[in-house]
């Protein structure tokens, strides 16, 4: 039973899908995907449940959601174990993901009150009221890299606002969503308020094109996001929020400070989660000169020592595998392409079996036209530069705009950088992958459609309703010209 529709666990009627552990290729989950008819049933169940769910006082919805948060906290190790088995991420890291799910719930509750409040005021004898109302049925598309945390960051704000949800997780991490949906069921969520449909492209297309949805919250690749954007472009009646990737630049100033700290910040930016975070550094701009040379030497030395292994290894790894063998091959092919274009490998990424890839660092300074691609893995491109102005210009030479960073102890350099860089998340002397849960998460360009998630998800899970009210109709002291009563 792999789908949760209208409160019932049911089998799919579509093609068989499997979740393969990327570190040993074992099948960890198997089921049949949802057909178009089953997707329509899930949307219909959500529509039916919406009528009663939106009527519930906010406090009643909050009680259930906080009960879910308590269950997530209680089952942290179980959730983390499943995520590790599906994604290959180290167990220590997946435990932090489960913890982040709990933290995001508290943030979302606060955001609901701060971003979508009820307000009243008097003006010229009228009562002016601002209310917020749920959109209706929200389709949520989840990614594989944070299969618990990222869908949670859309589902919870949607439910708090009074919406109902149909979740379509990544076909590479179905088990995680199944485990989490069972916690929602245990928390006492009414039937149909959340529905789970598993499947690959066909299931996703059926959900995205379903007439019964009022909005779609997407986290995933830019290619898929752009397809959805084109699909929804003629349908202004549906809300679309896209959270996509980035070709993220990290600029190392000549005044980068202590070498070891700078190296640590680069490692955390480029290779955490085996490079499978949308905010990971993809391009590293390093100043020409002795200090930059020495920094790169040390960076390569440290990157060589990164422990890469399966998530539960006795020698605790920093990095796990890529999500799949195909994803691992993509990184190795990208490296080969950059080498063919004139790039020089400072540390060559290598296959370590199954979906494992070791860290790669390639000097792409001599590549005439650096491909503007998101290499979603442990491959860092280095470009040497003369001036900060040149570095910022190069950093902005991308269609993306998710994250960017500057490593510098010079305040004036930071002021210049933050003024001229084009990105939604901009950090100084901190890893690019660091972001506050109560700050907007998103960026311009191909990284999204200006609907950032996290704290700001409340903005597009409810629409504002403005009212001008009086206890009874009134006749003004002076009628409008040309009117007689």
Swiss-Prot record:
Superkingdom of origin: Bacteria
Coiled coil: none
E.C. code: 1.2.1.71
Alphabetized CDD domains for the sequence: ALDH_SGSD_AstD
Pfam families named in the record: Aldedh
Keywords carried by this UniProt record: Arginine metabolism, NAD, Oxidoreductase
Function, in words: Catalyzes the NAD-dependent reduction of succinylglutamate semialdehyde into succinylglutamate.
Name of the protein this chain belongs to: N-succinylglutamate 5-semialdehyde dehydrogenase
Lineage start: Bacteria, Pseudomonadati, Pseudomonadota, Gammaproteobacteria, Vibrionales
């Amino acid at each position: 039973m792999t789908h949760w529709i209208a409160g019932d666990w049911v089998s799919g009627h579509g093609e068989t899908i499997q979740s393969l552990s990327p570190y040993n290729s074992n099948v960890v989950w198997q089921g049949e995907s949802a057909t178009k008819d089953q997707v329509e049933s899930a949307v219909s169940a959500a529509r039916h449940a919406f009528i009663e769910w939106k009527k519930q006082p906010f406090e009643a919805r909050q009680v259930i959601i906080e009960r879910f948060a308590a269950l997530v906290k209680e089952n942290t190790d179980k959730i983390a174990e499943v995520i590790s088995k599906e994604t290959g991420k180290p167990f220590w890291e997946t435990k932090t993901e489960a913890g982040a799910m709990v933290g995001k719930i508290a943030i979302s509750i606060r955001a609901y009150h701060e971003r979508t409040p009820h307000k009243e005021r008097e003006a010229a004898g009228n009562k002016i009221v601002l209310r917020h109302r749920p959109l209706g049925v929200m389709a949520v598309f989840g990614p594989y890299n944070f299969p618990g945390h990222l869908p949670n960051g859309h589902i919870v704000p949607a439910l708090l606002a009074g919406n109902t949800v149909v979740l379509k997780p990544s076909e590479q991490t179905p088990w995680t969503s199944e485990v989490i949906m069972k916690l929602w069921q245990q928390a006492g969520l009414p039937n149909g308020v959340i529905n789970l449909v598993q499947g690959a492209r066909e299931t996703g297309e059926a959900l995205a094109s379903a007439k019964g949805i009022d909005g779609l919250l997407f986290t995933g690749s830019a290619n898929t996001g752009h397809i959805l954007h084109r699909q929804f472009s003629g349908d202004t009646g549906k809300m679309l929020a896209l959270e996509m990737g980035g070709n993220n630049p990290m600029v190392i100033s000549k005044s980068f400070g202590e070498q070891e700290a700078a190296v640590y910040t680069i490692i955390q930016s480029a290779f955490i989660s085996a490079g499978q975070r949308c905010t990971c550094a993809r391009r590293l701009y390093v100043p020409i000169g002795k200090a930059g040379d020495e920094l790169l030497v040390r960076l390569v030395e440290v990157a060589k020592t990164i422990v890469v292994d399966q998530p539960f290894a006795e020698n605790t790894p920093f990095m796990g595998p890529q999500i799949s063998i195909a994803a691992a091959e993509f990184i190795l092919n990208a490296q080969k392409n950059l080498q063919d274009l004139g790039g020089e490998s400072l540390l060559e990424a290598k296959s370590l079996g199954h979906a494992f890839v070791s860290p790669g660092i390639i000097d792409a300074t001599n590549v005439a036209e650096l491909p503007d691609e998101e290499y979603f893995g442990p491959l860092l491109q280095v470009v040497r530069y003369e001036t900060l102005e040149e570095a910022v210009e190069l950093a902005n030479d991308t269609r993306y705009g998710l994250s960017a960073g500057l490593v510098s102890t010079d305040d004036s350099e930071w002021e210049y950088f933050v003024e001229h860089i084009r990105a939604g998340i901009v950090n100084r002397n901190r890893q690019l992958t660091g972001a506050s849960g109560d700050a907007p998460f998103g960026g311009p360009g191909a990284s999204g459609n200006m609907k950032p998630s996290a704290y700001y998800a409340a903005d597009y899970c409810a629409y504002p309703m403005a009212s001008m009210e009086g206890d009874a109709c009134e006749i003004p002291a002076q009628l409008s010209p040309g009117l007689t009563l």
